[in-house]
């Protein structure tokens, strides 16, 4: 949850920087920050490897960032925290 909140705050800051920038160099920095935020968001949504079994070191699932829904073709194997689930392909 901390990661998602941080990304949301960074996204807001990037948008604010872009709107408030008066120099080309500031605009370039805002565009760069916006690009980093979008890449971070897609990395979270795409899935980070996770363990379905707490007692195993095998990364046999992917984290899902869809409020408890793993999506079509996936099944939930473990809750990681309040936002993320560890999901496996069916």
Swiss-Prot record:
Predominant location category: secreted
A single GO cellular-component term on record: nematocyst
Gene Ontology molecular-function annotations: potassium channel regulator activity; sodium channel regulator activity; toxin activity
Signal peptide (from-to): 1-21
Pro-peptide positions on chain: 22-44
UniProt keyword annotation of Disulfide bond present: yes
Subcellular location: Secreted; Nematocyst
InterPro entries: Myo_ane_neurotoxin_sf (IPR023355)
Record keywords: Cleavage on pair of basic residues, Disulfide bond, Ion channel impairing toxin, Myotoxin, Nematocyst, Neurotoxin, Potassium channel impairing toxin, Secreted, Signal, Toxin, Voltage-gated potassium channel impairing toxin, Voltage-gated sodium channel impairing toxin
Disulfide bonds, paired cysteine numbers: 50-86, 52-77, 70-87
Further comment: Negative results: has no hemolytic activity on human erythrocytes. Has no effect on the shape, color and configuration of cardiomyocytes. Does not show significant effect on the calcium currents.
Function per UniProt: Cardioactive peptide that acts on voltage-gated sodium channels (hNav1.5/SCN5A) and voltage-gated potassium channels (Kv). The activity on sodium channels consists of inhibition on sodium current inactivation with no significant effect on current activation. This effect may be caused by direct interaction of the toxin with sodium channel site-3. The activity on potassium channels consists of a significant increase of the amplitude of the transient component of the potassium current, shifting the current threshold to more negative membrane potentials.
Family the UniProt entry places it in: Belongs to the sea anemone sodium channel inhibitory toxin family.
UniProt name for this protein: Delta-aiptatoxin-Adi1a
Organism: Exaiptasia diaphana
